[in-house]
Structures are given as structure tokens and as C-alpha cells.
Amino acid sequence: MDQQQQGDKNLTVFVGPWGGNGGTTWDDGIYDGVREIRLVYDHCIDSISVIYDKNGKPAKSEKHGGVGGNKTSEIKLQYPEEYLTGVSGYYCPMVNSGTPVIRSMTFKSNKQVYGPYGVEQGTPFTFSVNGGRIVGMNGRSGWYLDSIGFHLSRPKSTKMINKLRKKIHWLTRIVA
């Protein structure tokens, strides 16, 4: 892991996963943000793929999940002005003896709400980031999206301090 990746990792936190333990583990890693999300779904979330931003360029993830589902939705954020700040959804088994899968997802940005996609049935989950953003996803998938977790950036206090300094400087010029 290079110094940039280590620095990025130190500025992020992980939340989740929500869902079941079927399928195989995946982790897209840590990026600068999310540009687009593509969901295929019907009675559950069949698959998810994401286009992240890495140093100002798009970086496409693999598709996580199966080939089912007859509805497709593409969420195109107005990145970098718009970014993901929260996700909610539901998970439960598709059949009585099966393991839980993600049944529904709703995405919240700093500008609007996208969804819900899928069926809002089962155990609910929700989280939101106060001052940060979603910068990566991970989970488990097989025939469906079995579970989902997120890498979140922490608020960068230096940016906030610099903004405050500029505002204070501007105010002192007006008062003087």
C-alpha cells in the first residue's frame, strides 16, 4: 500500500455490512467519491455496479451480483458538486430457508433522494454521514446482492478551517 492509499485509509471509516452471508466477498476500495450507480432489481437488488471518481477520472467497478432482475436504474450524480451522504434499505431472505439478501436500497445525496429501488420488506437499515461522503462500497454477492457496506470519508477539518479563515478575513475587511 503506497503512502497516498494509506493516507486515504486513515481518513475513512467503514460502516456495515447489512444483509446476509451468502455469495462471495468483494470490496471496491476507497475513491474520491461516487459518480454513478447502476442497480438491477425486481423483488430484491440483483446487482450493483458503481462508477467512482479517482483523481478527477471515472473508475468503474465490477458488477456485483447475478444476471436476474427486469428493472434497471442508473443514478447519475452531478459530481463533484453532488455526493452521496446516506443509504437506507431492507434485507431479508427471498425464501424461507435462504440467507438474507438486500431487498431494497434508497440513496441520499447532499441534493436529493434516489429511490427506493426494490421491495421495502424485511429488516430495515439506514445511515447518513454528517459532513463526510461515501467513497467506496463492499459486501457479498452471488445470484443477488447479499450484503452491502460502505467506506466513508471523514470531514476534513483543514478544509473547514480554511473556509472559516477566508470568511473571517473577508469580514474583517468589511468591518475595517
Curated annotation (Swiss-Prot):
Single GO MF annotation: carbohydrate binding
Highest taxon above the source species: Eukaryota
Keyword Transmembrane helix attributed: no
Keywords: Lectin
Protein name: Jacalin-related lectin 19
Residue span, Jacalin-type lectin domain: 12-154
PROSITE patterns attached to this UniProt entry: JACALIN_LECTIN
Oxidoreductase recorded as keyword: no
Entry's family note: Belongs to the jacalin lectin family.
